[in-house]
Every structure is written in structure tokens, then in C-alpha cells.
């Protein structure tokens, strides 16, 4: 049964990064009781009076909460309500004490004063002409924003985006909404086509309008990118756009063909089919193919025999023939791929290549896609290694796009670039890396092709190997190691599609769970036994799961382990405490922290969270606090590029969609010393037997082969 609740927002417990879900505490206007409310939308302001519509439900972990189907900002009426609203910090020039003085002077008529005769605020001690002007301008801005919010909320647009729209366009907001609404897709990060389309239609845009149709086509291409595709077949794009916009396919085809003819929508022809791109991905695929082909004509540097002998002598080892071959090819080729699983000698080979490069007085630069992968590369090579983003001096623009300062105009100075964990690079990052190489520079890509594909579009490492023109060194011989041999042996079994088994040394163990709750209990027991809450284990151990949702999903595991670590219940699903292990969710170039970086919370106050990362401290305040998440548990995808002494990997039949060989292989190989697999025979069998056969729409390989035409 739907109920209405009115009250004042007292505290935001959780606000999702995309502004689509929040949990907050509400002080009920009638009972004055504090209650929990959940809303699928952006979080309201603390101190804001709101009217909620919804129903009560019992959350399995957090108890009774009011599930809002609608949230409406309302004007404060009672004096206490007004005081909380004014003291919230929304209005510039008014703090808690000033709010009290204003309400003491005007009582329940305070908001009437703000609306109709704001000059009367001069009667309040402490408000002079300058302060009044500040209050007046700030309140007027809030009024305009609130009016816009109410209009957009009626169309299902979240408050967060309404605020962003108002900040971006100011006095021109109405003009943009009425005459050029689709520019908001480009201008407002995170605001999607469907939300903008609702605004446009409400403002009278013709459903058959060609501008609307072309933006719909772009939206469908962008959706393909989210599935890992770099482009999409014209026919499927037109069909899906027709269904999305509820217009005939003929209308879509006419608008689409016109946009393609005028090169507004880039396209490539391959095998008698046309594939459509967004401009940035078109440039990435076509230009990357040209650059790679041009790099194939590199002049050999000479024999690496002396360098190999020097390396073997200094390190008291003998390189395998395949490793020696790789060192020589690195000195001969413009582009080289080195691929192999754990224990096959990739790290040793990188060090040998560095020695050979120095023989020829060549400067070397080491990179990796993630911070943890770069740190591992640095430790194993004895040389500094950076993330690719840091090496290319990436900056985030207001539009949400990334600009790389290192490019054709200001390339990297080094002669040989070595990229580890190269299988993680999508085609866009790969392209920007190629743009940053100076004339004559050599590129060596090191990676494990059997791991998960990139999160972003394309799979350039796989395509380079498939092309057959780039020299590829496959390291297959497993060198015996004192630690982790049980992990390496089982990883090899998985890679070949065979079942994995526990080893006698206990480096690879399997807990066979009878149910999802049994698996959850096993995770918690192992965390207790291994003392996950200790400072040492927090960073050397990791719990992994394929998915965020579910009893054994990352979200639930994180909260449960957090409570285990602290020894008491923790309020809210995103409440941080000193000592918590956290992960940065997106690249922040100003702070110098990157997607996947792990840190420890060392202090928390009312509005700030202080996190220690390796070698630096970062402060999060305001909306920045949504840039981190608990990291006691993480997805296998997020762990790629990282290694830990101990890994607990959960893999269950209920996670069926994720049960694939490369995911199991990637999860298992994150551990150096000990892997604990919590699973069932059926889930393991399904995972090892199911290869990721889903092909991605990408024309990088046909473009390399010269088979595709612009």
C-alpha cells in the first residue's frame, strides 16, 4: 500500500556514483522519529524538506526502510524545518547560527520573506548589504534549479542531472532544452540519450525528426561499445534504433544513410557489410592499423648475443632458447608480442630485453594498464614503471573525455616501450599509446592472452597475434618455482580445458560448497582463520567474485567482511571506517590515483575521508567520496593486473552467466602463494568447458589485413 511521508533529510548514508540510487535518514515531520529511506534517484540535500511516496519493506540486512517510488522537494513550513533547511549550507552566506537568527526574527513567515521581500533580511543582525546580495543571488539560483529539477523529475530525470544541466547552461538552460536538447548528451557526463529524448519530446520535438533519429543511431552504437564492441553492423543498428524510437525503419534508414554520406557517422565496409562507429573509435581503429603497419619496417639494431651472455652471467641463470629468440626479436622488430601464462618466464625475459636495449644505448620505458600492475613490473624489473595514463600525462576534461598530453606533437622520448598486462588494453588506449611513440620507437607488448579481454572496446593484443605479421613469442615451458607451483599447474590445466585439483602442499585448495549460504559461510570462516583484518593481510589477500549482486556477490561480501573486521555492525552499505580497505573506482588525474588502486582509510570526519595509498595520502570530500568503494572483495575483472599472496575465489552455479574458462583462469592466477577456490564440481566443470566465444565487433584486424575499406 502506497504511503506518503514528509520530513527533513538528516544524513546521506549511501549515494551511488551514477546518481541512480541513494539511502538516507529522514526525520519524520509528524513523529520526529529518524527513519531510513531508499530511493532510485540522486540523493537529496541534507536539510532539504521532502515528500516521499512509497511503502515500507524489510531489508534482509538493514531492517525496516521506506522504499520511495517518488521523491519531491517541498518548501519548509515549520520553524524547525526552516531552520534545518537554511542551516544546510545550500544558501551561500547562511550558516547554522545565522539560520537561527533569521528564523527567530521571522518565524513561520521566513520562506515568505525569501520569496516576496528578501530585502527584509537586512533586519537580521549580521546581514549587511554585501551579505544580503550574496544570499539573494544564491537563493535565486536555488529557486531556478529547483524549478528545473521539478520539471525534469516529472520526466523521470534525476536531480543530479538537473543540477548539472543548470550549472552548465545557466540562463541559457531553457533555450537549450527547447531548441537544441540533444547537445546535452555530449555536454553532460553520464546523461544518456533516453533521458534527453524524453526532454526533447516534452518540448515538442517531432518523433520523426532526423536530428532525433541520428542521435538515436549514435546511442545504439554507444550501447554496443558497452558490450566491448568497437563498432556495430548497420542493419542491426537501424533495426534497434527503429524499435527504440518507435519510428519506421525507413525513416531511420533515410536519416542514417544521409548521416553516413555526410560522414557525420563514420563507417567501414567489410565483407559486403557496413559497420558504424562513433568518431573516436573510428579514429582509434583505422589509425592504429595504419601506425602498426608503418612500424613493421623497423631497422634491426644488431645481435643481442653479448647482451644475453652478460645477463645470464650477472643473474646466474641460463635463458631458454625461446627466451633468447624473444630478446633478439625485440632488437629487430618494430612491434613484438610476448605471451605466456604464469611461471613461463615473462618477467625474466623483460629484464633480459632491458639489458639488451642498454647494449645498444637505447632508452626503455616500462608501463602497465593499472597501478598495481605497474608496481609489480617495477619491482620485478628493477626499473621505474608507470600506468599508461600517467606515462601519457592524461587529463580529464570537463566534458568527461580524457586528453593525453603525450601525443604526436609531444611524443615520449624513449626508444623502446614495454607494456606489461597488454591484454587489458582496449583499442582506444592502445591508439593513444601509439600516438605517443616517437618516430622509430619500438613497442613490446607482454601479456597473457588467455586472461579476460579488455573491459573497453576491441581486443588489440588478440588481433595483433591473429594478424600473423607481428612477431609473436609464445612462452609455454613452465619453470619450476618454490612457491605457487600448485597454482601454476592448475592454471595450466584450466587453460587447456581440464579440471583443477587440490595439491598436496595446500597452495591450491578447493572448498566444495553445498549451497550459496554455505559458500558465504566458508568465505567468512577463511577470512577469520587468515586474519584478514590484520594490517599485513589486508593488502596481501583478496576475496574475488565474478559478480556484484547476490549472497556471494562483491557488495554483500564487502559489507559482511567489513563487519567481521571491525567486530560490530556497520551502518549503511557505503559507510567507511578507519582501517577499511578501499578501491578507487575511476581515474583521477588531479589526485594521482587510478581505477583499481587499493588503499587504507586512516581517518574519517563529517565530510572527509582520508585514504593512504602506496606512497601517498588522498583526501576525499563532497561528491569525491563516491569515487571509492570497499575492497575486501572485488570482481575478477577489477583484479586483473594485480597479484596477491592469497586469493579466495568464489565461483558458484548461481553465477552461471560468468562461468567461463578465462574468468576462472584469471581469478586463479591472481595468487602468488595460495588460492582457495570456493565452488562446486558442476560450476568448475562448466567454467573450464566454456570458452569465451562471444566475438566482438571490431575491424582492427581486417584493417590490418587491408580487407576493410573506409
Q: Where on the chain are the PLM-derived regions?
A:
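C-terminal accessory regions
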Residues: 496, 597-710
Amino acid at each position: 500500500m502506497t504511503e506518503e511521508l514528509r520530513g527533513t533529510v538528516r544524513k546521506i548514508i549511501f549515494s551511488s556514483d551514477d546518481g541512480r540510487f541513494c539511502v538516507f535518514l529522514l526525520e519524520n515531520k509528524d513523529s520526529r522519529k529518524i527513519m531510513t529511506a531508499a530511493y532510485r534517484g540522486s540523493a537529496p540535500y541534507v536539510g532539504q524538506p521532502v515528500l516521499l511516496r512509497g511503502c515500507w519493506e524489510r531489508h534482509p540486512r538493514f531492517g525496516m526502510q521506506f522504499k520511495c517510488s517518488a521523491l519531491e522537494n517541498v518548501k519548509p513550513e515549520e520553524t524547525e524545518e526552516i531552520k534545518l533547511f537554511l542551516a544546510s549550507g545550500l544558501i551561500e552566506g547562511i550558516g547554522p547560527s545565522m539560520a537561527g537568527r533569521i528564523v527567530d526574527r521571522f518565524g513561520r513567515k521566513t520562506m515568505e520573506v525569501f520569496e516576496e521581500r528578501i530585502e527584509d533580511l537586512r533586519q537580521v543582525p549580521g546581514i549587511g548589504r554585501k551579505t544580503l546580495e550574496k544570499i539573494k543571488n544564491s537563493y535565486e539560483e536555488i529557486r531556478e534549479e529547483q524549478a528545473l529539477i521539478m520539471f525534469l523529475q516529472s520526466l523521470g530525470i534525476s536531480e543530479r542531472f538537473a543540477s548539472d544541466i543548470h550549472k552548465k547552461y545557466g540562463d541559457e538552460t531553457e533555450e537549450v532544452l527547447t531548441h537544441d536538447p540533444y547537445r546535452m548528451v555530449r555536454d553532460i557526463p553520464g546523461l544518456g540519450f533516453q533521458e534527453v529524448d524524453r526532454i526533447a519530446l516534452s518540448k515538442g520535438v517531432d518523433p520523426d525528426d532526423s536530428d532525433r533519429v541520428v542521435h538515436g543511431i549514435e546511442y545504439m552504437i554507444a550501447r554496443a561499445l558497452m558490450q566491448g564492441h568497437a563498432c556495430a553492423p548497420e542493419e542491426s543498428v537501424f533495426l534497434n534504433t527503429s524499435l527504440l524510437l518507435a519510428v519506421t525503419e525507413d525513416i531511420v534508414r533515410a536519416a542514417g544513410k544521409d548521416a553516413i554520406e555526410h560522414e557525420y557517422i563514420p563507417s567501414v565496409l567489410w565483407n559486403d557489410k557496413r559497420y558504424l562507429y562513433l568518431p573516436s573509435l573510428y579514429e582509434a581503429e583505422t589509425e592504429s592499423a595504419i601506425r602498426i603497419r608503418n612500424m613493421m619496417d623497423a631497422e634491426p639494431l644488431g645481435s643481442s648475443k653479448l647482451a644475453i651472455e652478460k645477463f645470464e652471467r650477472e643473474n646466474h641463470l641460463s635463458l631458454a632458447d625461446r627466451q633468447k629468440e624473444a630478446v633478439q626479436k625485440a632488437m629487430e622488430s618494430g612491434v613484438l608480442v610476448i605471451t605466456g601464462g604464469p611461471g613461463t618466464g615473462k618477467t625474466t625475459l623483460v629484464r633480459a630485453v632491458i639489458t639488451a636495449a642498454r647494449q645498444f644505448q637505447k632508452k626503455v620505458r616500462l608501463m602497465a594498464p593499472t597501478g598495481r600492475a605497474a608496481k609489480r613490473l617495477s619491482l620485478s624489473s628493477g626499473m621505474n614503471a608507470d600506468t599508461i595514463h600517467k606515462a601519457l600525462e592524461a587529463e580529464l576534461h570537463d566534458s568527461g573525455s580524457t586528453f593525453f598530453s603525450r601525443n604526436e606533437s609531444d611524443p615520449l622520448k624513449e626508444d623502446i616501450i614495454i607494456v606489461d598486462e597488454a591484454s587489458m588494453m582496449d583499442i582506444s588506449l592502445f591508439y593513444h599509446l601509439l600516438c605517443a611513440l616517437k618516430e622509430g620507437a619500438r613497442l613490446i607488448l607482454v601479456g597473457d592472452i588467455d586472461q579476460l579481454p579488455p573491459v573497453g572496446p576491441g581486443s588489440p593484443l588478440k588481433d595483433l597475434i591473429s594478424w600473423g605479421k607481428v612477431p609473436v613469442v609464445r612462452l609455454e615451458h613452465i619453470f619450476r618455482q618454490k612457491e605457487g607451483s600448485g597454482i601454476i599447474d592448475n592454471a595450466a590445466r584450466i587453460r587447456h580445458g581440464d579440471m583443477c585439483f587440490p595439491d598436496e602442499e595446500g597452495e591450491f585448495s578447493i572448498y566444495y560448497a553445498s549451497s550459496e549460504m554455505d559458500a558465504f559461510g566458508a568465505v567468512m570462516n577463511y577470512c577469520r582463520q587468515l586474519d584478514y583484518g590484520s594490517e599485513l593481510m589486508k593488502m596481501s589477500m583478496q576475496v574475488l567474485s565474478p559478480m556484484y549482486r547476490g549472497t556471494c556477490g562483491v557488495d554483500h561480501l564487502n559489507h559482511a567482511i567489513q563487519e567481521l573486521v571491525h567486530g560490530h555492525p556497520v551502518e549503511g552499505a557505503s559507510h567507511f571506517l578507519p582501517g577499511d580497505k578501499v578501491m578507487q573506482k575511476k581515474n583521477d588525474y588531479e589526485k594521482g590515483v587510478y581505477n583499481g588502486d587499493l588503499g587504507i582509510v586512516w581517518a574519517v570526519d563529517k565530510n572527509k575521508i582520508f585514504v593512504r595509498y602506496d606512497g601517498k595520502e588522498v583526501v576525499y570530500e563532497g561528491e569525491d567520496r563516491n569515487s571509492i568503494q570497499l575492497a575486501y572483495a572485488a570482481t575478477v575483472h577489477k583484479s586483473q593486473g594485480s597479484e596477491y599472496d592469497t586469493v579466495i575465489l568464489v565461483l558458484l552455479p548461481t553465477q552461471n552467466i560468468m562461468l567461463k574458462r578465462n574468468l576462472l583462469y584469471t581469478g586463479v592466477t591472481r595468487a602468488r602463494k595460495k588460492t582457495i577456490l570456493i565452488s562446486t564440481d558442476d560450476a568448475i566443470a562448466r567454467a573450464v568447458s566454456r570458452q569465451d566465444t562471444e566475438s566482438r565487433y571490431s575491424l582492427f584486424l581486417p584493417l590490418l589485413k587491408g580487407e576493410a575499406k573506409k
